[in-house]
Design a protein with these regions (language model features):
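Bacterial N-terminal signal peptides
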Residues: 7-19
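Positively charged n-region of N-terminal signal peptides that target proteins for export
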Residues: 1-4
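Surface-exposed flexible segments
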Residues: 203-209
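Generic secondary-structure boundary signal with a strong preference for alpha-helix termini
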Residues: 19-22, 208
Length: 223
């Protein structure tokens, strides 16, 4: 069974991330050239995320362009909070919600094929979605971005942080292979409908499994 670790994902949310180690293609050597290759992949991931209002669509494009699954469809693997789950005050403020207005918290791993590409904490105001949208979120593993696509939403980014860079690397690393940590990039954002009304706040942490498509050095890179 795959091991998991807990990692804070901002605000008071907690996401479950796959343990790091071995997600990058086995055998990718720890050289300047290969670290540069990984850095380019991280930068490409950031550009993909920054140019899509929907993280779901961004990850499906990423999964498809890097041939990471036969069917590049992202599904939301739900996680159940194990303790008290109060809505952070900052989320209520960002969403313009009163202290008594219902806000739901959906915590998921976004999965494409066998790859857990991100973990996401999503607080949303059910009164600002349709009844069908709420039923789908409650009863299926559909990703949030697909469910609320009919709102024609935009993304107001509040945070976008690179959590790890392969460059220049540690001079004390003697393992001989590049081993990213579990967390690569994090973003926090408010989603707004076509009228500009906020309906959701998300904290998304993108994992080292976004890089698992990278091949070990081969003839294409040897010359």
């Amino acid at each position: 069974m795959k091991r998991f670790l807990l990692a804070a994902v901002g605000l008071s949310g907690v996401g479950i991330l796959p343990a790091s180690g071995g997600c990058l293609a086995a055998g990718l050597p720890d050289t300047a050239l290969d670290r540069a290759r990984v850095l380019l992949a991280v930068q490409e991931l950031e550009i993909t995320l920054l140019t899509h209002p929907s993280a779901t669509v961004a990850l499906e494009d990423w999964c498809a362009s890097h041939h990471m699954a036969d069917r590049p469809v992202v599904v939301a693997r739900k996680m159940i909070p194990t303790g008290p789950d109060p809505v952070p005050a900052r989320v209520r403020a960002d969403l313009g919600a009163s202290a008594t207005q219902p806000i739901r918290h959906r915590q998921v791993q976004l999965v494409c094929g066998t790859h857990v590409l991100s973990v996401a904490d999503n607080w949303y105001v059910p009164d600002r979605l349709t009844a069908d949208m709420n039923a789908t979120l409650d009863g299926t593993d559909a990703a949030f971005g697909h469910v609320v696509a009919g709102l024609h939403f935009s993304r107001d980014r509040l945070e976008f942080t690179r959590l790890w860079s392969p460059w220049p690397g540690s001079p004390h690393d003697t393992a001989g292979v590049i081993t990213p940590p579990a967390q690569i990039v994090r973003q926090r954002a408010v989603l707004r409908d076509a009228r500009g009304q906020p309906f959701s706040e998300v904290v998304e942490t993108y994992t080292d499994q976004t890089l698992s498509f990278m091949p070990a050095r081969d003839a294409d890179y040897a010359h």
